[in-house]
Design a protein with these regions (language model features):
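Beta-propeller blade termini and top-face loops
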Residues: 1-424
C-alpha cells in the first residue's frame, strides 16, 4: 500500500540506523542494507518521532493511536493509556447520561457513556456496536436497541444491544476486494453515510454512489436516486496504482460522502459527494436537483448542516486537500441551494474546514471543526474566531450537539465534550 505507508526516518545521532514504517516497523543498523522488524503494539504505522537528545526515546503513531518507548523499542506504552483514538464521525443518543458513538480507526465502532459515577470514564465504559473502523452509525436516539453500522466496501450491519449479535444487511452482497471500482455494481466511500430519518426512525438510508432506503431493518432496500456523483470512469481504476492495488476501498472515488435529512421536512434529503457535487430532493427521492455552488471545485463535500431554525438554510463544508488546496471552504444557502455565499472570514487561510454545526438554541451561532482545532461564529459565519480552550490542536472530523453540550470527534485525541453551550 505505497500510498498509505511512505515514511522513512533516520536516527539523528547515528546515520547507520534507519526506520521504515509500514504495516510493521522495520529497522536497519547498516544504512538500509538489511532490515529486521521491531515489535510494536499496533500495525499500520505512519510516523515516528525520535528524541534528538536520547534516540532510545521514541513516539510511534499508528492506526490504533500512539505509543512511547524509552528503551529503543524493546517495550512500549500500552494502547489504552492515553486517549489517542481517531474517530471519523460522532452521534449521540438521548439516554441519561447520553452515550457517544463513533467508528474509530482500527479499533472498531464503539459507544461510551458521556458521564459515569466512578472515577472517570475508562475502558469499562466502552462497548462495541455495529460496523467497523470506518463506520457511520444510525439508530433511534430514544431507543438505541438496534444500531446500524457501516464498514469499508459498503458493508453494513444491524446490531442488537440486548443480544450483542450482528447481522450483515448489505444491499448487494458482494465484497470487491481486489476488483476495480469501475466494475462495481455500486461504489461506496470508505466512510459511507448511514442515517436514520428524524421523522420515522424505522427508515434507514445508506449512501454509495446512489442513495438506498430500507423500511424493514435492511431486509429489503430500495434505490431512491440516480448516480449523484461525476461517475468519471478514468478515476475508477485500481487504488494505489497498477502494482500495489489498495483493494480495501480507501481510494474508491465518485462516491457519496455525506447524507442528511431535514429535521423540518420529511423527505427533504441533501447529498454531498467526494467529487464536489451537492444534490437535493424535496420529495423523498423521486426527483433530485443539482444544487452545487457554481464556484465549487472538484473536492470532498464532507458535511451538510441543515439549519435547525430555517428549513431553507444549510451549510456545507468542502475539503480540497487531495488537490493540494488547504483553503477553508464553507458555503451557506438560505433558499434550498438556489444560491450560495462563502463564509470563511476569520479562518486561517491554510486551514481545511471539515464540519460546521449550528447551535440548536441560538440561530446563527456556529461551530466549525477544522484541521487545526475549533472555530466559532456568532453571526451565521460572516466572521469566525478561534475557540480552542483546553482542546488539543488536532483535526476535528465531526461535531454534534446533545443536551447543550458540543461533542467533537477528533483524528488522534478521541472524543472531547464542551459542557454547557449556554455560556455563549
Amino acid at each position: 500500500r505505497s500510498w498509505y505507508y511512505m515514511e522513512i526516518f533516520t536516527d539523528p545521532s547515528n546515520e547507520n540506523v534507519v526506520y521504515v514504517l509500514n504495516a510493521p516497523v522495520l529497522k536497519s543498523i547498516d544504512k538500509g542494507k538489511t532490515f529486521q522488524p521491531i515489535s510494536v503494539p499496533h500495525g499500520d504505522n505512519h510516523h515516528l518521532w525520535i528524541n534528538p537528545l536520547n534516540p532510545k526515546n521514541m513516539i510511534n503513531s499508528n492506526d490504533g493511536g500512539a505509543n512511547i518507548t524509552f528503551n529503543g523499542g524493546e517495550s512500549w506504552t500500552r494502547q489504552d493509556q492515553q486517549p489517542t483514538a481517531q474517530f471519523y464521525r460522532v452521534i449521540t443518543d438521548n439516554k441519561v447520561p447520553y452515550h457517544v458513538y463513533g467508528g474509530q480507526q482500527d479499533n472498531s465502532a464503539i459507544g461510551i457513556a458521556s458521564r459515569t459515577n466512578g472515577r472517570g470514564i475508562t475502558w469499562k465504559d466502552w462497548y462495541s456496536v455495529a460496523g467497523c473502523e470506518s463506520a457511520y452509525l444510525a439508530f433511534d436516539p430514544n431507543n438505541p436497541e438496534t444500531v446500524f453500522g457501516g464498514c469499508y466496501q459498503g458493508i453494513i450491519d444491524r446490531w442488537s444491544r440486548s443480544t450483542a449479535a450482528s447481522k450483515s444487511i448489505k444491499e448487494y452482497p458482494e465484497l470487491n476486494l481486489g476488483n476495480v471500482p469501475k466494475d462495481f455494481k455500486y461504489r461506496f466511500n470508505w466512510n459511507a453515510p448511514i442515517i436514520s430519518s428524524p421523522h420515522d426512525r424505522s427508515v434507514i438510508y445508506h449512501a454509495g454512489n446512489v442513495v438506498f432506503k430500507t423500511l424493514d431493518g435492511g431486509i429489503n432496500w430500495e434505490v431512491i436516486s440516480p448516480d449523484l456523483t461525476r461517475n468519471d470512469k478514468a478515476h475508477q481504476g485500481p487504488g494505489g496504482g497498477p502494482y500495489t492495488n489498495e483493494a480495501a476501498g480507501g481510494e474508491n472515488y465518485n462516491t457519496l460522502m455525506y447524507l442528511t435529512e431535514s429535521p423540518h421536512e420529511k423527505g427533504v434529503l441533501w447529498a454531498g459527494s467526494d467529487d464536489g457535487l451537492v444534490h437535493l430532493t424535496r420529495d423523498g427521492g423521486i426527483n433530485w436537483s443539482n444544487v452545487t455552488p457554481k464556484e465549487l471545485p472538484e473536492a470532498i463535500v464532507n458535511s451538510i448542516e441543515v439549519s435547525p431554525h430555517d428549513p431553507a438554510a444549510a451549510y456545507i463544508t468542502v475539503m480540497a486537500y487531495k488537490f493540494n488546496n488547504l483553503k477553508p471552504m464553507v458555503y451557506k444557502t438560505s433558499d434550498y441551494g438556489v444560491s450560495w455565499v462563502k463564509r470563511v472570514s476569520g479562518i486561517d487561510d491554510q486551514t481545511v474546514v471539515r464540519v460546521v454545526r449550528e447551535d440548536k438554541e441560538v440561530e446563527g451561532l456556529l461551530y466549525a471543526g477544522t484541521e487545526a482545532g475549533l472555530y466559532i461564529s456568532f453571526n451565521g459565519g460572516v466572521f469566525w474566531q478561534k475557540i480552542q480552550l483546553n482542546l488539543p490542536i488536532v483535526p476535528i472530523n465531526d461535531l454534534t450537539i446533545q443536551d447543550n453540550d458540543l461533542i467533537a470527534a477528533t483524528a488522534g485525541r478521541s472524543f472531547w465534550i464542551l459542557d454547557d453551550l449556554g455560556a455563549f
